[in-house]
Amino acid sequence: MALIDLEDKIAEIVNREDHSDFLYELLGVYDVPRATITRLKKGNQNLTKRVGEVHLKNKVWFKEAKKGKLFDALIDIEQQVEYLSAKPRYLLVTDYDGVLAKDTKTLEALDVKFEELPQYFDFFLAWKGIEKVEFEKENPADIKAAERFARIYDVLRKENNIIETNRGLDLFLIRLLFCFFAEDTDIFKRNSFTNLIKTLTEEDGSNLNKLFADLFIVLDKNERDDVPSYLKEFPYVNGQLFTEPHTELEFSAKSRKLIIECGELLNWAKINPDIFGSMIQAVASEESRSYLGMHYTSVPNIMKVIKPLFLDKLNQSFLDAYDDYTKLENLLTRIGKIKFFDPACGSGNFLIITYKELRRMEINIIKRLQELLGEYLYVPSVTLSQFYGIEIEDFAHDVAKLSLWIAEHQMNEELKNEVHNAVRPTLPLHTAGDIRCANAIRVEWTEVCPAQGSEEVYVFGNPPYLGSKKQNKEHKSDMLSIFGKVKNGKMLDYISAWFYFGAKYASTTNAKVAFVSTNSVTQGEQVSILWNELFKFGIQINFAYKSFKWANNAKNNAAVIVVIVGFGPLDTKVNKYLFVDETKKLVSNISPYLTDGENILVSSRTKPISDLPKLHFGNMPNDGGGLLFTITEYTDAINKYPELVPYFKKFIGSVEFINGGLRYCLWLNEAKYEKIKSNPLIQERISISKNHREKSTDKGTNKLALTPWKFRDTHETTNYSIVVPSVSSENRFYIPMGLAGADTILSNLIYVIYDAEIYLLGILMSRMHMTWVKAVAGRLKTDYRYSAGLCYNTFPIPELSTRRKNEIEEAILEILDLREEQGGTLAELYNPSTMPIELKVAHEKLDGIVERAYRQKQFESDEERLEVLLKLYQEMTER
């Protein structure tokens, strides 16, 4: 049940004339079982016999109080509870004019008017198993507003038969948001907007549209002579918020009631404009949210971007200038000239938080100047005209502008309260920066936010991610316009376009840039493709947050693993910082893999850089199922034709190898086929294979119909093979690899090293190799997609002595023996939560042996391992 559903249901109970079932109905709202409530009403579960009182074990002790005697009633039941050593969670008394309640666990009290009870629905959330502290952390008051606002949106869409996105409705909602905020923050007179609707419109909502149309005209009028008397108290707003004519809408009793409740039940002064993004998420369709990237980003996460990008430096400048009024004045001038640009601004979260931080810095500078000089005349420095953005979605674009106006008003109030004799009027509104409604990939950023090389400009944001497989036709067209001539450019995520344009913009304007991104731009196959292009613009990475979980406070938020990458023009004077969790490390250079090291890029290769045998795909049947047998089919076949046993081999693919299971295949050459071709089963199965190949539209497959008794590929081992799954879960510490004998044929869904030395399996199952795979492998969803070109052929291995190889071989054989002893599938054995401790220890022993081949000093982290591997890769590829 949504939050506002709880509130609304309690409002229904409170507004009834008959309150004889008040407690039972209240308990029902919080999902106390109906059977329990029925027995309670009958007295079966009421643990007290006192008249007018109800005691439900562990839940509540309730008492109806005499008029005006709430405290006496509460003291009375408190004494009863203490005397009986009872443990009800809540004590609750009411005379139906007021409500007094106490939470016996937290000792928190509630003392409100009876009609106000719905607003405090969260007080009794423990009945639903939700602690209030937890609730307040997860569901701020802003979300309550978002849900209530979303309900208005849904009802109006239904009442007006609106299916597609509608500009008129969207604009109406933006204006409605402003009016709610204005009446609670003294831009309008208190409650004037809601009272206007309550007193001058019919209950059925029939004349509500006309009222809104008239009001919006007045709010856009500077001349007030012909304004109707009942609207004269509403001021001229400007900012073009009300300039566009109001679109006629149908209203009903229901939508009118929801609008009034939105004004009466919410204190809009407490609602942060940066949460308006969550309102957009609440009203926008799931599809729009996913594709257009209308992210609501929490303040702590925004600070991770803007602090290292510019805010830390500005704060340090303030401290450095603290006792020097000339330096303070220079800093004041400087912060009034900086430009801030979010080219995927959504509903404006990053711009709003940045604006507020700059205004607070302005306030602190003015206060300090007044302390130093006695008097200091306030002249506005930071203005909305310094803020720029691009947003593709109309609705979010309009909310971004509205949110900036609201943020401006809030900061004007803060200024008035903090600085003596400083006043900055909100109305009439001024242009809210330059927020363009456009596709950021199709416009020149220098046209949106023009800047000379000498100007201070910061670009930041949380652009849409969208992997290549999730991109629609428009997205693919956008990407083609940028990366069409780049080899493998089609593999890049959509966010790569923002990195490209950010680098291009920085190269011509000297801007500093920072984006939140999925970690695809810093690990895996996309790294070399993207950063080869970015480095052409002469940029460097200035700071970065390595992978962390990014969540927001918006409704039903989903966490994703992201990185933050800050970059700008080449500058040896810039201190470069790597952030890992809560630690901050000063480094000489940050590579595209977010390591402390040179800008090395790992590209796919056709041959191994180390002295390694070739990694093959397994064997593709391309047989229409004719040559493959399930265990049951195989058993039936050899029971009926025992003479066929020598012509079968085990057949394993990636799924069977990791999760267990087995199939069989007919493994024939021409000579073997000639011996058994008259067998009815063989004839049937070969016929299936031949028909499949003949009907194929692929000419190569058609040729295979000439030899329908054999696989397309016919690799086999004389001894044993190293088996490498092509896909493995990202959650595993190691990719489960192993050995297969000559009696097993491996499918094309698995990689194979035929007749390899066993020590090589130890190398490939080491943490060093796993670190490499994490950094350079492609992804299938979030799982690692192993490949010969990127993972195996590029893996740098130092020269190994015979002794080292023998040590590695002994360690991997010990692991194989342990796996045999433990039993179970590889998926079970390598599940990180259930991996046997003996197996973990054996792997750690192997890791140590392999790592000492790279250096004698013990590695402290995977970051260190990757730094060493990248350096060795560079050395080996430059030889």
From Swiss-Prot:
One of its GO terms (biological process) is methylation. The sites are enriched on the left chromosomal arm. Its EC number is 2.1.1.72. Gene3D superfamilies: Vaccinia Virus protein VP39. Keywords: DNA-binding, Methyltransferase, Transcription, Transcription regulation, Transferase. This is DNA methyltransferase A. It comes from the Bacteria. One studied mechanism is via transcriptional repressor ScoC (also called hpr) which binds to non-methylated scpA promoter; when the m6A target is methylated ScoC no longer binds and scpA transcription is up-regulated. Other mechanisms for gene expression regulation probably exist. Binds DNA with and without the target sequence. It catalyses: a 2'-deoxyadenosine in DNA + S-adenosyl-L-methionine = an N(6)-methyl-2'-deoxyadenosine in DNA + S-adenosyl-L-homocysteine + H(+). One of its GO terms (molecular function) is site-specific DNA-methyltransferase (adenine-specific) activity. Disruption phenotype: Decreased promoter activity for promoters with the target sequence very close to the -35 SigA-binding box (scpA, hbs, rnhC, yumC and zapA). Belongs to the methyltransferase superfamily. The gene is dnmA. Pfam families: MmeI_C, MmeI_hel, MmeI_Mtase, MmeI_N, MmeI_TRD. PROSITE patterns: N6_MTASE. It comes from Bacillus subtilis (strain 168).
